[in-house]
C-alpha cells in the first residue's frame, strides 16, 4: 500500500494470510489483525490459510480464484512466519499414534536427507550450491535489486530492520567443519539447511479491469493454479508434480 498510494484502502475486499503455525502471537485470526494494523477499513474481511510451506502460495491461489470467479475485484495475499516465537510443531503438539507409525511427523531436514540419498546429492554438492546461493543474494543486495521490494521494519523504536539477515559471506572452511544437523551420517548441515527465520510478504492482486482503471502497474498475470500431494517423506518434491 505504501508503494501504491493512489489506492483507496476501502477498495480492498479481502485479505488472506498464509501461516504454517497460526498459534501464539500468530494466532487469533492474524489476517484481520494485519489488516487493522495496516489501516485497512473494517469492511475488509480476513482469513488465515495453512498449507505448511505452501501457505502463502495458497493465499495467492485463493485471492486470485475469488477474482476470477467475480466474487471480488481487489484483495491482498500475504504470508508471515515467526519461527523464533512459535516452535516447530507448535507449542503443544499431540501426535496421533497411527500417523506417528507412518512417520507422518517427520521433520523437513529428514525429508531433505531422503531426497539427497535418492538423487545421489553429496554434501560437497550441497555446500557448493549453498555458497553460490549466498553469493548471489549478497550481490543482489549490493546492487539494490531488492530496493523496490523490501520495506524497512521499525522494531518499536529499538532498531530498524532494513535488509535480509540470512545471506552472509561464505566461509568454506567453517562450512566443511560443521556436523550433520539431522542424521548422524547425514549430508545436510546448518550451512545447507533452511534457516530459522522471521519474515513476511504481501502482494496486491486485482482484476485486469481494476488495475487499468486505477493505473496500477501490472507486474504479473495469474493464468492458473494447481496443487497435488506427494509422499510426506518426500515433501520437498511437492512443487514438481503441481507445476507439471
Question: Which sequence ranges carry the predicted segments?
Answer:
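Active-site-proximal alpha-helical scaffold in enzymes
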Residues: 49-80, 116-145, 202-209
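Flexible glycine-/small-residue-enriched beta->alpha junction loops
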Residues: 68-119
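Conserved catalytic cysteine-centered active-site region
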Residues: 15, 19-74, 103-109, 169-195
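Conserved active-site "lid/cap" helical segment
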Residues: 1-20, 24-34, 38, 45, ...
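N-terminal extracellular/periplasmic Venus flytrap/periplasmic-binding protein-like
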Residues: 6, 125-213, 218
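Beta-strand segments within the central parallel beta-sheet cores of soluble alpha/beta enzyme folds
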Residues: 9-18, 45-50, 75-81, 125-132, ...
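Glycine- and Gly-Pro-enriched alpha-helical subdomains that act as flexible
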Residues: 206-244
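Short acidic, glycine/serine/threonine-rich loops at helix termini
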Residues: 27-28, 85-91, 233-235
Amino acid at each position: 500500500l505504501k508503494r501504491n498510494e493512489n489506492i483507496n484502502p476501502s477498495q480492498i475486499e479481502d485479505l488472506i494470510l498464509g501461516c504454517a503455525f497460526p498459534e501464539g502471537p500468530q494466532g487469533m485470526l492474524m489476517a484481520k489483525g494485519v489488516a487493522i494494523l495496516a489501516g485497512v477499513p473494517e469492511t475488509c474481511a480476513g482469513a488465515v490459510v495453512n498449507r505448511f510451506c505452501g501457505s502463502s502460495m495458497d493465499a495467492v491461489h485463493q485471492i486470485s480464484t475469488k477474482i476470477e470467479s467475480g466474487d471480488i475485484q481487489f484483495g491482498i495475499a500475504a504470508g508471515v512466519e515467526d519461527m523464533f516465537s512459535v516452535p516447530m510443531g507448535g507449542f503443544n503438539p499431540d501426535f496421533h499414534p497411527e500417523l506417528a507409525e507412518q512417520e507422518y511427523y517427520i521433520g523437513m531436514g529428514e525429508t531433505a536427507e531422503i531426497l539427497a540419498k535418492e538423487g545421489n546429492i553429496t554434501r560437497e554438492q550441497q555446500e557448493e550450491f549453498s555458497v553460490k546461493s549466498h553469493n548471489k543474494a549478497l550481490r543482489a543486495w549490493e546492487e539494490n535489486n531488492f530496493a523496490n521490494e523490501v520495506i524497512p521494519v521499525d522494531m518499536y523504536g529499538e532498531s530498524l530492520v532494513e535488509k535480509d539477515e540470512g545471506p552472509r559471506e561464505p566461509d568454506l572452511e567453517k562450512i566443511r567443519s560443521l556436523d550433520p544437523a539431522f542424521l548422524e551420517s547425514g549430508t545436510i548441515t546448518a550451512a545447507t539447511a533452511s534457516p530459522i527465520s522471521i519474515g513476511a510478504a504481501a502482494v496486491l492482486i486485482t482484476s485486469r479491469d481494476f488495475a487499468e482503471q486505477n493505473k496500477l502497474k501490472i507486474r504479473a498475470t495469474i493464468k492458473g493454479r494447481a496443487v497435488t500431494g506427494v509422499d510426506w517423506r518426500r515433501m520437498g518434491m511437492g512443487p514438481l508434480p503441481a507445476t507439471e
